[in-house]
């Protein structure tokens, strides 16, 4: 035998060893290939979508830890480009996300080509919803919307869905009762961040989004979390104060031990469909303790533990302690998550025996290993830890050990010392194990990529095929290249025999994309995204303990709209309230004309800090450390995160005048300045154009109690009161006047036999008749004479009624009987036909002189009186002195009466209340005593006409009763049926003349009669005697408007009474109707001249009177002395409107009477003259006969303007006119738009130093140690993550001014810092020195109207300015609200007598003008066209000026430039109103959400919308719920019907503009079931089902099911119950519900009725 060391034996040994090595290599390569294939099958969704590059699509912002989705993010790609179609029903989804906005958005959805949902994950507040198909979903109680990073995994394995958190330690499982057999549609679409185009967008950051085809990946998903996602994880605890981030020390070991969680809150699951029963279970898995001697730790175990670092050896125990329980419970209540703690220690050569941590094992104690940990040499050496702190929390970042575990003895490697990135512990070198038996070949794997050419092996004999072995567990992922340890170099193998060339292998399939590469460098910051859509409001949570005031919360979840409540009862009138605070600024009105630029205002306070920018990634909050020695300057680090804003500095010195800047943004309105001292009178400016009517000022203090007000409007009729007891008989009333003759009654029964009549006179003897023929045989003879009167017999029985006898002849008219008892009041008869007007009665005798009556209301316009005689020539007055300048006048008189406002629309009808159960009948009460006579009730509603009763039997003739007293007035009976029109009655007897009635209402204007002949001059009457002075009467309450009385005769004029005392001002009575014209009485004698009366209030402008007769020409007055020259008056308004009549000129001398001229041709009728002064009352003329109505004459042309007359003397003050009627308040003006912001005020002066703050609480940290020596210069550190903005420290005391440093170089422009917190408002600084005159800036946008300033002292009256140019005619403004009447002003001094004017000659009548052009048709402007119509009105006024052909050349031309500018201004307002609707019927919005986005301070209520923005005739009145995110709610026509009064087109637009809808339908039932049966409590066969708007059927167990809020109708206990159905869907086309089927049939004792709630769209 050859020895073993021979070459052949060595060759055999080498061959055996080489085959073993080759087998191991093949096995290792196979494992690696399997691992690579498994990893290659994983899908990195972000990489597939192209979101991890330097330039992501629009709407995505790249960050170091992933990508941020904004509202502009749009990802909708085919599924095949993201997920392999071969993905089965078992896979895992690993997510690392952070939500920035609370809403109900989907993270992703996979939709089939038929737009059906296949797979989707939705984050709602407090829950995660996973959709598997269109109708199946499951939700987990897990809150993602808390602003922190969340690492989680979802395992989907057939019918089972499991949510893993805490690195797999916590899982919640849900099972579905059906198998989702739908496969992935290759033609479907993948959407990221939303479900559909109209749904809400997910706003937040995504660091990792991977899909693994294996369900095992979710069990320990932390192994697959990327590095940058771990660093961004905010579940890890923050660093303690005064400890910065630890550097990545290669000598540091990071240990993490699991903690047994003893109590975990049960996770609740719920399904949205009733047919899915889910078995949920809460389980907690704890990874096993470490058993390998190489200290292989789990990657990231999110359990919780507490360890202590002591000076002695300490053992980390996995058992829970009391401290652990308390802290775990606290953290669970706070965040509902499990946090991680770890211990970080470093090796040090100083002490290697002091600290040692033993890691015990759980299964193999003999393999436990020990490693040593030394004291920390980091910052803890410079500053000791607090005594109470036994550990500190550091960033929980873990990496897997790079030492692979031994593979159950099948393979052995010589191990080098283990290399760690953070775990640098060298394991023991293992002994080589025995070679194990070859395993069976595994299942064929996927064809891999073509590998490098391997060495040629020996040709072995083909072995028998083995049975396929079981699938091995997935191995741990390999270590990244460069970090893996190099294996022990093996012995060189022998050179193998050259193998035969193998057949070329088949071409491998294209592999899946490889794993994602290392994260790239920080990309360029993309543009800021558009603001995101408003999220759905969250559901209301359970009330927690009262915490500190938090930040402004997000909008709440869409609530169920409540039932509209009934209006409450009217409350009692409260006491007058305290004057309220100044109200908020009203909406600005229409813009006024542009005024001149005012002087610059004082420096304003600093404005508010702007809104904060987008929230950055939260960093770790570090506190300020102790000040150390100044070290050498380090390298320039990267640009840091902008710091917090500093304290505002002191106001600097005034700089030099700079160049004019760009026009600034409108600033906020400055505070009201301090009242300045009165300045000198300025130069009189040009009068500006007339301004708009200003906003109503603040309400003044309550004035004294006014006079008694007018009676209020008649209120609505109250409910019928309880019938009161019968009242006592009233006093017999005065017999009323005789009524009209009634209809002829039916023939009455035969009356009793009348008394025998008086014996008549004997008749005349008749004429002898002819002898008669022989008569027939006579009848038996008549009964003989009665015998003697016998005794009275007994009363016999009542005999039967005899037959009705024949009607006898009409008897003579009997005497008038006694008045019978008053009969019952008959039914209200129908009003009779109006009677004809009676003749005027004869003139009555003149009555006695009456006392002076109260001041009557203003009568109608009288007819033109006859021309009176010439008055005497007045004496020449003395020249008056020029009076002193009067004080400024008080508030002017009230304006003209406003237009009558339109009647408001009826309010919405409230929902019908639920009918209460009928109560049991009460016990009969004791008969009460008759109560006092009640006040007459309100007229009750008319009852229905009763059916005609059967005729009763005729009673016996009653005895005539005694005349009864007059009964009380009965309640009005029901309206009887229409009776036949009776015959016209006889004319009544002329009654006596009644008293004079009040003035009747003004009648319509009658036809113009022919001009009567001039009457003869009446005789001058005698002067009456003066009456006595009457007492002033009290102010009477306004009585009801009386009916016009009969026309009384005109009484003789009474004697003139003496002047009475001035009575109190009576209230304005209602305008009476115009009565008929009375007879003209004789003219009274001229009375004596009364005293000068007090000036009365300004009366309303009377109607133009009839043109009076031309007066006689008076004598020529003497020429008065010229008065002082008056000041030149201001130019008046445009003369298009008739001006007030000028004073009458002096009467000229009477000329000689000329010869009678020839009658001239009839002149053209002139224009209607200006209302002349009322002439003296002429003598009454004889009334002429009414002539036929003449044809209207043609309108004459306007005559030439006559010469200007001389100023006549000022007439005496007229008598005090009666106050005009109070006008009806006009319609409320349209609320104007919110004005633009004003220009920013100047910076205010620096505030004074604040007071020294209170000393803070003593911190738990120890004293600060002595500063250490300066350390060596460190290398430039990597830029850290941006930290969360720290809390503002207390304001320090003002330091002493330091020495001025050397001037530094000009630095680079710094980045935009975060906006600082708004500082306390400083005291108002002293006004600064006036600056130099700057260049005129660009005209800014008009700011809102400021608050009214305090009234300053009256300044010195300035000189009168020059006459201004005529202003343009402004646009017609809205009718203002009629203001209260002002107090009458004091009586002014008598004015100076004017200069005598020269009387001008009377001009001839002008020629007749041509007929005018036809007028334009009327145009009904809507609200949107008001401004445009006003602009057109401005231009039409210019054309009117040209058409009327004024000859006055003094009128200035209109400024076309300013007119065009004003038109453009109106057009801009019009466009603004279209873009920003008000929600009124004239200016509707498309949806309520538009109003919410345009106006942020609207209240919930009724608004108008027009979804199709078409004609205003189909506008919809809706209820807007802005507190629910801008819901648009459509109410049904009635609360018990499903009909909604919206057209089909408008409803289609509402569906297009909405993304979700909700509606509630309630069925009120009594002993009847509509859903569940009483036995099974499950939907019965007789349940109702619904028809949606698009025709789909909604029923239990169907494709779409209704949700139940309450189902109590199965209870049949004789009481009313209800079942509430809620329909909430993200397909708005389903609502509203249009029909309900299978409603139950009611039986005796069972009822139901519907209550249909509004349908709300969002």
Swiss-Prot record:
Coiled coil: none annotated. Ca(2+) binds at residues 1506, 1508, 1511, 1514. Residues 1458-1658 form the Fibrillar collagen NC1 domain. One of its GO terms (molecular function) is extracellular matrix structural constituent conferring tensile strength. Keywords: Calcium, Collagen, Developmental protein, Disulfide bond, Extracellular matrix, Glycoprotein, Metal-binding, Repeat, Secreted, Signal. Residues 1-38 form the signal peptide. Residues 66-229 form the Laminin G-like domain. Residues 491-506, 657-666, 678-692, 837-852, 875-890, 1112-1124, 1215-1230 have a biased composition (Low complexity). Weakly expressed in the notochord from the 6 somite stage. Expressed throughout the notochord at 13 somites, then becomes restricted to the distal tip of the notochord by 24 hpf. Also expressed in head cartilages by 48 hpf. One of its GO terms (cellular component) is extracellular space. Residues 308-332, 345-364, 427-550, 571-614, 637-1332, 1377-1415 are annotated as: Disordered. Residues 425-478, 493-552, 556-615, 622-681, 685-744, 748-807, 811-870, 892-951, 952-1011, 1024-1083, 1084-1137, 1139-1198, 1199-1258, 1268-1327, 1361-1420 form the Collagen-like domain. GO terms for biological process: bone mineralization; notochord morphogenesis; skeletal system development. Residues 434-444, 1402-1415 have a biased composition (Pro residues). It is found in: Secreted, Extracellular space, Extracellular matrix. Residues 1040-1058, 1125-1137 have a biased composition (Basic and acidic residues). Residues 308-323 have a biased composition (Polar residues). Residues 1421-1658 form a propeptide. Residues 424-1417 are annotated as: Triple-helical region. The C-terminal propeptide, also known as COLFI domain, have crucial roles in tissue growth and repair by controlling both the intracellular assembly of procollagen molecules and the extracellular assembly of collagen fibrils. It binds a calcium ion which is essential for its function. May play a role during the calcification of cartilage and the transition of cartilage to bone. Together with col27a1a, plays a role in development of the notochord and axial skeleton. This is Collagen alpha-1(XXVII) chain B. It comes from Danio rerio (Zebrafish).
